UniProtKB/Swiss-Prot annotation:
Listed PANTHER family: SPERMIDINE SYNTHASE (PTHR11558:SF11), SPERMIDINE/SPERMINE SYNTHASE (PTHR11558)
Protein name: Polyamine aminopropyltransferase
Main localisation: cytoplasm
Chain's role: Catalyzes the irreversible transfer of a propylamine group from the amino donor S-adenosylmethioninamine (decarboxy-AdoMet) to putrescine (1,4-diaminobutane) to yield spermidine.
Residues annotated for S-methyl-5'-thioadenosine binding in this entry: Q35, D110, D141, G142, P167
Gene: speE
Top-level lineage group: Bacteria
GO molecular function: spermidine synthase activity
Residues the record lists as binding spermidine: H66, D90, D160, S161, T162, D163
Cellular localisation: Cytoplasm
GO biological process terms, semicolon-separated: spermidine biosynthetic process
PABS domain: residues covered: 5-241
Length: 285
């Protein structure tokens, strides 16, 4: 919400906290068939996209999220050629995926085309890869897309979704994970944004349990900073048909494209498990 002093504030009542950003102006607001989208110009974080009152993307720190949702999984898979991005309408994850020359096809499936069109207008740097011949943008229900896809047709699935409410709620259950498992090839990996380890620990633990129930052999969670998200600390959880410890470190160290956060050392560090998190997994998984 915006208050009289020109601050945008997102409150987290369940955790007794909030995030506020000083704004210069509201640039856009609309209600789509799926959600309410707002764009602000802020004093310190550049442009900010807000969906249903929740911060999604800012100019200043989006690189943290997009790099960590993509490069760790792509350097864990032995040979990622085909990638699906479920959600990801701001196109930042698509841009990072297509920095990998070995990727031959990347399909982004987002239910709300307006997110992408507004990103193209207000966050054009995130959409630089939209015209890449390897990219395909679909504006349909990602859950239905996965359900109708053939067996063993994709190497990596990235679920770059909003919080597990509204249009994204169906992306956090066993039925969806089973369909992803079916669609993945032998060494296939699913990675899904999994909220804050401080605020949403039971959700992450349940994701590990449900992913394994859906047939995945291994699960691992990686951690990274994300200032505009609840608690400022975020996570992504991988589920693999095979070994998730096969980090292609030589390839990561020799990467031919620039990143602002991700490198081989960050990759290793991101998977370090805090004691409280390990305890929760042992208790709840």
């Amino acid at each position: 919400m915006c208050d009289a002093q020109d601050w945008f504030t997102e409150s987290y009542p369940d955790n007794g906290s909030a995030l506020s950003l000083k704004i210069r102006a509201k640039l856009h607001e609309e209600q789509t068939p799926f959600q309410r989208i707002e764009i602000y110009d802020t004093e310190s974080f550049g442009k900010l996209m807000v969906i249903d009152g929740c911060t999604m993307v800012s100019d200043r720190d989006n690189f943290l999220y997009h790099e960590m949702m993509t490069h760790p999984v792509l350097y864990t898979h032995p040979a990622p050629k085909t990638v699906w991005i479920i959600g990801g309408g701001d196109c930042g994850s698509l841009r990072e995926v297509l920095k990998h020359s070995e990727v031959e096809k990347a399909v982004q499936i987002d239910i709300d085309e307006r997110v992408t069109r507004l990103a193209e207008r207000y966050f054009p740097e995130l959409c630089e890869a939209n015209g890449d011949p390897r990219a395909e943008l679909l504006f349909i229900d990602g859950i239905q897309w996965v359900k109708e896809a053939p067996d063993g047709c994709v190497d990596v699935i990235i679920v770059d979704s909003t919080d597990p409410v509204g249009p994204a709620e169906g992306l956090f259950n066993e039925a969806f994970f089973r369909q992803c498992h079916r669609c993945l090839r032998t060494d296939g990996i699913l990675v899904q944004q999994s909220e804050s380890p401080l605020f949403h620990l039971p959700l992450i633990a349940s994701m590990h349990r449900i992913m394994r129930q859906a047939g995945f052999a291994q699960t691992r969670t990686l951690f990274f900073p994300q200032f505009i998200y609840p608690s400022g600390w975020w996570s992504a959880t991988m589920a693999g048909k095979g070994d998730l410890n096969r980090f292609r470190a030589d390839a990561a160290e020799a990467k031919l494209f620039p990143t602002r956060y991700y490198n081989a050392d960050i990759h290793r560090a991101a998977f370090a498990v805090p004691e409280f998190f390990g305890d929760a997994l042992r208790e709840l998984v």
